[in-house]
Regions:
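Intrinsic low-complexity, disordered N-terminal segments enriched in polar/charged/small residues
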Residues: 4-6
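Short, positively charged and aromatic/hydrophobic N-terminal segments
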Residues: 9, 15, 29-38
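N-terminal Rossmann-like or analogous alpha/beta NTP/dinucleotide-binding catalytic cores
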Residues: 36, 40-187, 335, 339
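Structured ligand/cofactor/substrate-binding pocket environments in proteins
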Residues: 69-78, 82, 91, 95-96, ...
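Conserved nucleotide- and phosphate/pyrophosphate-binding catalytic cores
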Residues: 71, 205, 211-377
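Divalent metal-coordination and catalytic microenvironments
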Residues: 120, 148, 202, 294, ...
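Short helix-capping/linker segments at secondary-structure and domain boundaries
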Residues: 152-158, 191-198, 298-306, 335
Length: 377
């Protein structure tokens, strides 16, 4: 995969100076020639930043490495990612650093990271049309997170709903990473100078905190980062098989779209439907039946199916069976692609490595600019 023209690489070293990690001057660069090297570095950084400005607006989204995604993940987020990759310069990151706040087994994290990468590609993300990489493969973001910590009041972080809820419900599993989670989120977005973030309206408060952190940094050190703007997506809230709560692996109410067909059938046949429809002859209420609602996404004839429920021409079992077969057929190509990718982890790792390398110049140029503004060079 050739790097995109808007992400032109720049030299990691100056014309005459010795370079250390992340392109920073080594201690030996203290002579007059070292000062010249520093000036060259500054010019190179400005050039890198200019060359990394995208021809199309740049969009960023982070994705938790939870393993194979379920139906709610696809309908609620992944389908939007696929659509956006042609409208924007799209950067998608599997956020394994974030996952460390709750996933503590190394092998589980490695496996779930690769599973999510394979699933995203199988479901339509094209590494030639977007950048897909793993968060920890660009460690510059952790440095920016620390620097953002120095401009972020603790009170902002303590008021976040996720932290407050976890502190009340699981006080023994609250760590510093959970508290500073929003700071790393802000760093994730702006280290690549992304100006847009795809979110549902319920996620607006999370993005607003990222914007506050960016404003705090820009106010103290000068205009450095764009304030990320939301791109509101039409993402449905997909209820789980219990019919009452949002589909979630932690609850165990999911439909695993990349699982084997028999597994999908079993999960769909277990779905709760209209609780007021007791007998086969009772009329149904498709507007409250989760099975009927899901038919909207897997066939243009859903209104006909709904009418069958209202008039009791169709039973709940029939409606479930039809939904199961449609979901199995819809995801069959993705299921095969997923299996092929998981059978060749070296190929999958190569795709992720190429994504991380593609955005390396942007991350390095951003950190050069940030260090200079903060007096660290």
């Amino acid at each position: 995969m050739a790097p995109q023209p808007t992400m032109t690489d720049v030299g990691a070293s100056s014309a005459n100076g010795t370079r250390g990690a992340a392109g920073r001057p080594c201690p030996a660069d203290l002579s007059p020639s070292g000062k010249l090297d520093a000036m060259t570095d500054a010019a190179a950084a400005k050039s890198a930043i200019a060359s990394s400005l995208p021809a199309k607006p740049r969009i960023f989204s982070g994705i938790q490495p939870t393993g194979r995604p379920h139906l709610g993940n696809d309908l609620g987020a992944i389908r939007n990612y696929v659509a956006l990759q042609d409208q924007y310069e799209s950067i998608y990151c599997i956020v394994d650093y974030h996952a460390l706040t709750h996933v503590h087994d190394p092998e589980t994290l490695r496996r779930q990271t690769l599973e999510m990468a394979a699933a995203l590609i199988a479901l339509g993300l094209d590494p030639e049309r977007c950048t897909l990489f793993v968060q920890s493969d660009r460690p510059e973001v952790t440095e920016l997170c620390w620097l953002f910590n120095t401009v972020t009041p603790v009170g902002w972080l303590q008021r976040t709903p996720t932290f407050k809820e976890k502190r009340q419900t699981q006080p023994d599993d609250v760590n510093h990473g959970l508290l500073t989670y929003p700071v790393l989120q802000a760093a994730d977005i702006v280290i690549y100078k992304a100006s847009l973030v795809p979110i549902g309206k319920d996620q607006a408060p999370h993005l607003e905190l990222s914007r506050e952190i960016v404003r705090a940094f820009n106010s103290r050190y000068g205009e450095t980062f764009p304030e990320p703007q939301p791109v509101y997506t039409q993402a449905p809230v997909v209820l789980g098989t219990d019919g009452t709560r949002k589909m979630s692996k932690s609850i165990g109410n999911t439909i695993e779209v990349l699982a084997e067909p028999d597994v999908i059938r079993k999960q769909i046949m277990s779905m709760v439907t209209d609780t007021q429809r007791i007998l086969r002859s009772d009329p149904g209420r498709p507007q409250v039946c989760n099975v009927c609602q899901l038919h909207r996404h897997f066939g243009e004839d859903y209104e006909e199916i709904w009418d069958g429920e209202r008039t009791a021409r169709t039973g709940c079992v029939d409606t479930k069976k039809l939904l199961a077969e449609r979901i199995i057929a819809h995801y069959a190509p993705a299921r095969e692609t997923y299996k092929e990718l998981m059978a060749d982890p070296a190929r999958l790792r190569r795709i992720l490595d190429e994504g991380a390398e593609r955005i390396r110049p942007i991350a390095e140029a951003t950190m050069t600019e940030v260090r200079e503004r903060m007096g660290l060079r």
